[in-house]
A protein has these predicted regions:
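Binuclear metal-dependent phosphoesterase catalytic core
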Residues: 113-116, 196-201, 211-240
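Proline-aspartate-enriched helix->loop->beta-strand connector
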Residues: 40, 160, 164-165, 169, ...
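Catalytic metal-binding/acid-base residues of hydrolase active sites
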Residues: 22-23, 49-50, 84-88, 126-127, ...
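Zn-dependent metallo-beta-lactamase
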Residues: 1-18, 24
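Core catalytic region of metal-dependent phosphoesterases/phosphodiesterases
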Residues: 19, 24-115, 188, 199
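Conserved beta-strand scaffold positions in the cores of enzyme catalytic domains, especially
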Residues: 16, 78-80, 105-106, 120, ...
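Active-site-proximal loop/helix segment associated with metal-binding centers of metalloenzymes
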Residues: 3-5, 118-189
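Structural motif
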Residues: 15-16, 42, 118-120, 161-162, ...
C-alpha cells in the first residue's frame, strides 16, 4: 500500500473547475466548455473518466489523451482523479509530475495538491455497484476501492482546505444496490469506513462524483459537494 506523501503533487493557480463523471464522453465535455465560454484554466475530473476502461472491446484511453491535447491547445490543463471505472494501473504507472502542455496530469491516490494556495487531499477509487456484470481486468478491477491510510488523517487533520475524490458521503436520496452480488454490501461498508476517516481530516470542502447526482449537504461541518455526470463546479477563489 502506497504510503502518504505530504508534499503536494502539483501547485495549481488560476481558474479551476471540478467536473463529475465523464464516462468517456470527451466530445460532449469539450463542446460544453466551448459553448459556455468558460475562461480556460485547470479542469479537474473527479473520476470515472474511462481511462483504461474497455467496454464492448472499445478502449477509451487514446481518445482521452487526444481530448487532453485538444483542450491544451485552447489553454486548458486536465487533471484526473481515479474513479472505479478507471484502470488503477494507469495511475500507478503515471509520472509523479507532468509539465508537457496538453498531457493529462493523473492525480495519484493518497497525495495532496495546492489550488491557489489551498491544500487539497486527493484519493481515488470506489466500489462498482455493477461489477457483477463487468469483465475483470477490462471494466472492473479488484484493486478499485478507495483507501485512506490512518497516517494521512493524523498528518492532515485540520490542515487541508478540501478533499478531492471519486466517492464521498452518500447524497440525499436512496442509491440502489445490486442484490446479485453477495459481497457488495460488505465492500460498501468498508468504503463507508474510508469516508468517515476522511471526514476526520476536518476539511472545509469535499468535491466528488460517482453518484450521478448534483447534491450539496453539510456533514460534520464539511460542505460536501457531489457533482452529477459532466456537472461543472467553478472553484472561484483564485486571487481576483
Amino acid at each position: 500500500m502506497k504510503r502518504f506523501d505530504p508534499e503536494p503533487q502539483y501547485a495549481l493557480t488560476g481558474p479551476t473547475y471540478f467536473m463529475g463523471d465523464v464516462h468517456g464522453d470527451y466530445d460532449l465535455v469539450e463542446a460544453d466548455l466551448y459553448i459556455r465560454d468558460y475562461t480556460p484554466g485547470n479542469l479537474i475530473l473527479l473520476g470515472d473518466i474511462g481511462l483504461g476502461f474497455c467496454f464492448e472491446e472499445v478502449d477509451k484511453t487514446r481518445q482521452f489523451y487526444d481530448f487532453c491535447s485538444s483542450l491544451g491547445k485552447l489553454g486548458w490543463t486536465v487533471y484526473a482523479v481515479r474513479g472505479n471505472h478507471d484502470r488503477p494501473a494507469e495511475w500507478r504507472c503515471a509520472p509523479n509530475s507532468v509539465k508537457v502542455e496538453g498531457f493529462p496530469r493523473l492525480l495519484k491516490d493518497n497525495t495532496t495538491i495546492a489550488i491557489n494556495d489551498h491544500l487539497f487531499y486527493v484519493t481515488g477509487g470506489g466500489v462498482s455497484l455493477d461489477r457483477h456484470r463487468r469483465t475483470p481486468g477490462k471494466s472492473w478491477w479488484e484493486d478499485e476501492p478507495m483507501y485512506v491510510p490512518p497516517e494521512a488523517v493524523k498528518e492532515l487533520k485540520g490542515k487541508v482546505y478540501g478533499v478531492l475524490s471519486h466517492v464521498g458521503p452518500m447524497p440525499t436520496g436512496r442509491i440502489p444496490v445490486s442484490t446479485s452480488d453477495a459481497g457488495l454490501e460488505q465492500d460498501l461498508e468498508r468504503e463507508r469506513i474510508q469516508v468517515r476517516r476522511l471526514l476526520k481530516m476536518k476539511p472545509k470542502k469535499w468535491f466528488y462524483g460517482h453518484y450521478h447526482k448534483d447534491d450539496l449537504q453539510l456533514v460534520d461541518d464539511t460542505d460536501c459537494i457531489c457533482l452529477g455526470v459532466r456537472s461543472l463546479y467553478p472553484f472561484l477563489d483564485y486571487g481576483m
